[in-house]
From Swiss-Prot:
Record text about domains: The cell attachment site mediates the interaction with ITGAV/ITGB3 and ITGA5/ITGB1 integrins, leading to vascular cell migration and invasion. This interaction also provides endothelial cells with the adhesion signal they require to grow in response to mitogens.
Binding site for Zn(2+) 2: 25, 27, 30
Ranges for region Transactivation: 1-48
Numbered residues of crosslink Glycyl lysine isopeptide (Lys-Gly) (interchain with G-Cter in ubiquitin): 71
GO cellular component: extracellular region; host cell cytoplasm; host cell nucleolus
Motif (Nuclear localization signal, RNA-binding (TAR), and protein transduction): 49-57
Protein known as: Protein Tat
Residues the UniProt record annotates as site (Essential for Tat translocation through the endosomal membrane): 11
Gene: tat
Region (Interaction with the host capping enzyme RNGTT): 49-86
Organism (species): Simian immunodeficiency virus (isolate MB66) (SIV-cpz)
Region (Disordered): 48-101
Amino acid sequence: MEPIDPNLEPWNHPGSQPKTACNNCYCKQCCYHCQLCFTKKGLGISYGRRKRKQRRRTSESSQNHQDPVPKQPLSQPGGIETGQKKSKKEVESQTTSDQFA
């Protein structure tokens, strides 16, 4: 075993760092390359910054080109309509007779 130089920092000691640089490969050999590779690749833990997901903003020009929603009459609820409908003449005759009562 080689004697350790007390003047060197622990991360610069011989054998403390692998001979090859870290890479982006996720094979088994590269996952066990060093402790950093193992935590990043093997365990999937990274302590870097998280990128914010940007929201899609609509530009002002695209908002001007939007067509307004046309107003449509409310649809009648479905069902048997024969009993609900009365002729206009019946309704008019009832309203005129109610006015004189």
